[in-house]
Amino acid sequence: SPDFVHMNYSPMENGAEERLLPLAQDMGMAVLINRPFMNGRYFGMVAGKELPEWAADFDCQTWAQFSLKYVLANPAVTCVLTETTNPDHMEENIRAAFGRLPDESTKGRMRELVREFLDYITLRPSSGKTLETLPRR
């Protein structure tokens, strides 16, 4: 069997939680996560939105950490691959690995919040935004 598997996973793209991540964990495979920020579109989606107060309960200070802590809280995840050329963004990303992580109940709240943001974009075409046109960080 393979030594590792590489997949997309984030609060927005969380379909792997049901079968793929548990299967990889059961098989003892390393799991490398790609696109925790949807190629940067995540930042367009959360731009101008305030981080919820309850994010402090799991030591989350930024929207980047919000997504990364969600991913890192899954016990099947071995490594999260982020892409940036900005040293400040890299430091912010690294800080997500420290402190508390969200529990399953909190991860449910995180999914719901992000789903609301996605629904706003996809269900209100008058906003002029789509996932494809969202600005990237």
What are these regions (language model features)?
Residues S1-F4, E18-R137:
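Structured C-terminal cap/extension of enzyme domains
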Residues V5-E13:
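Catalytic beta/alpha-barrel core
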